[in-house]
Amino acid sequence: VLAHVTAQMKAVEQGAPCDLIFQSIAGSQKGNEAFGFTARTLEEAKALMLQKGTAEGPNVLYFETGQGSELSSNAHFDTDQVTMEARCYGFARHFAPFLVNTVVGFIGPEYLYDARQVTRAGLEDHFMGKLTGVSMGCDCCYTNHMKADQNDIENLAGLLTLAGCNYFMGIPHGDDIMLN
């Protein structure tokens, strides 16, 4: 369920079966607070899942990231998007998540202007995920008002495949459900 971490925690506390708790994360404390949580919240979520969750292993969290989220909440402290995104992966790694994926291009041309920037960001995110050792995947997407099309997104998916991307969260196949 792609709900806020606290809503998922309440469901687990009430007996709902759950293998993974999801949360979008940012690369700064201020960014995460803008998303409505703190590191302590994630620690509590992990402890709850290890006690009451249905997963068999110790990796019970799923995080989504994406370049630009700190800029949209004015939580970047004049730091570039790539550095802030790298901080996301270091933060994620602390919690030993089962999955981490970037949703590259979702936030729009205000932060990634066109297909070239989306491609660059997707490859940067993949590289940083590999460097930090998180189980890194990608959701390749774009917004309708961005200078990109499905061919660009499929090209990115192909490049990420060649680069050894662990998984894709949704495969474009000439159509993006988020655009319909």
Short names for language-model regions:
Residues 2-180:
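Anaerobic metallocofactor- and corrinoid-dependent redox/one-carbon enzyme cores
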